[in-house]
Amino acid sequence: MGGLIDLNVMETEEDETQTQTPSSASGSVSPTSSSSASVSVVSSNSAGGGVCLELWHACAGPLISLPKRGSLVLYFPQGHLEQAPDFSAAIYGLPPHVFCRILDVKLHAETTTDEVYAQVSLLPESEDIERKVREGIIDVDGGEEDYEVLKRSNTPHMFCKTLTASDTSTHGGFSVPRRAAEDCFPPLDYSQPRPSQELLARDLHGLEWRFRHIYRGQPRRHLLTTGWSAFVNKKKLVSGDAVLFLRGDDGKLRLGVRRASQIEGTAALSAQYNQNMNHNNFSEVAHAISTHSVFSISYNPKASWSNFIIPAPKFLKVVDYPFCIGMRFKARVESEDASERRSPGIISGISDLDPIRWPGSKWRCLLVRWDDIVANGHQQRVSPWEIEPSGSISNSGSFVTTGPKRSRIGFSSGKPDIPVSEGIRATDFEESLRFQRVLQGQEIFPGFINTCSDGGAGARRGRFKGTEFGDSYGFHKVLQGQETVPAYSITDHRQQHGLSQRNIWCGPFQNFSTRILPPSVSSSPSSVLLTNSNSPNGRLEDHHGGSGRCRLFGFPLTDETTAVASATAVPCVEGNSMKGASAVQSNHHHSQGRDIYAMRDMLLDIAL
């Protein structure tokens, strides 16, 4: 029997306290218990303590609920078998679910690990109970709210903290958040130079633990010092485990432990729990169900993410719900601080978990995809009663998880297949057809150079027509500053040039009277270079009166201005000179085609 433990003495006489082994406390259903809670506590030690239902529930987690005596529940053998050591070989021919009445509930806590579990006694109902409930012949009294023994409104003042390396060190103490200390602990006298007090807390086994609570440091903080190291050593706590304090309505302080494996939902079953499961083997459970006799099971709330004992109203509410692929939902999940939150996701499939042994079972029949992939080790399969449908059905695009960076979609890895005369390829035309979204700073704007002799008006007409063509050719969702204007390889074959090229474009392209700007000179619209038709030399001048070089973030995008000028200044003469000029122009166009891809990659690298 566990007695009063003074941890101030334990620090120096730890060997003596080792002999005071805490006893396992259990609770049982009492017929004389109040209607608000059908689980009462039986005193288990001389100190007058026992299992606190609030503390047991806090250690189990916010998602766990205990059934009241006499409530109608559904027992899922398939879910229970998942926790059995012989799950792979267990074939007993049980139905997917069984309607049962709760006869008894006993609370247990593992002695060495403080792991909580319950022993539940159930009585199978008749086989036609489901039909009678659906037809309204039998009224499911109460409802889902009456299923829980512990009312949510009676939740005491509680805080849960995950231990850090400093909290578990032998030379440090336990740092308590200020708001938590003021809510759960008795108030300190802050008029003293070093406010302090002694705390007395009782654990699941009824053992009392004493800590020194002090408010000190710079900046000041709440600390548990004397007695804390002995508690850590006794409970074998490590970094990642969680400790919770709660203050009930009676003002008493209680203390619980939650292991890191329990928080992650991967708790290994304790030896005592496994022994109880082996004692109540599934062959006896199957026999009890077939004969409608009482059977008992051990219920570990942390052994699985899904509960295999649920209230009947909760099951009947969702059993006929039209779930479908693409439907969005929210599910209750547990946070690290033992609080409850909603985690969203989407249904990606509907199928039986084990169609051979459990055909038509609702147990974890929904395949889901969570929006928060790494949250609390979410399962890829859930049961219908574990989620709440929210919103409308998502489209197919919702199944694609977007990464943090934009991938280079819309740009082909190879060269386009649209041929252009003189070796030039209209790369921007093909890419703009697929490029549905262009981000700011990623646009490509080759300039239009008009060589018509009808002055500036003709240049403006040619420039406006080019813009209208680009807009009508498929930019469905392009915002301002995100346009992609292709470079048109259209040359005006005037007699004074001495060159006779055939026009390869048809339709609206034949209305252009422009000459291509070297693709290396491309930038945003504010940096487009235009040809001043009134200039005597026909030189390229910056649109803003600057130099003829295009810069991005202060760096020149091309160094081929000299080469371009020399290539375009080839004299147009008769005979062999004309052939030589055509050869030079052809070579220059080939180099321009290569520069298009180099410049595009450079712009993408800068923008990304």
From Swiss-Prot:
Top-level taxon of the source organism: Eukaryota
Tissues with expression: Expressed in the whole plant.
GO BP term (any one): auxin-activated signaling pathway
Compositionally biased intervals (Low complexity): 18-40
Disulfide bridge map: none
One Gene Ontology molecular-function label: DNA binding
PROSITE patterns assigned: B3 (PS50863)
Keyword set, alphabetical order: Auxin signaling pathway, Developmental protein, DNA-binding, Nucleus, Transcription, Transcription regulation
Subcellular localization(s) per the UniProt record: Nucleus
KO phenotype (gene knockout): Double mutations in this protein and in ARF4 protein significantly suppresses the adaxial development defect of leaves of the AS2 and RH10 proteins double mutant at high temperatures.
Pfam families (UniProt xref): ARF_AD, B3
Residue numbers spanned by region Disordered: 1-40
Similarity comment: Belongs to the ARF family.
Quaternary structure (record): Homo and heterodimers.
Protein name: Auxin response factor 3
Lineage, uppermost ranks: Eukaryota, Viridiplantae, Streptophyta, Embryophyta, Tracheophyta
Gene name as annotated: ARF3
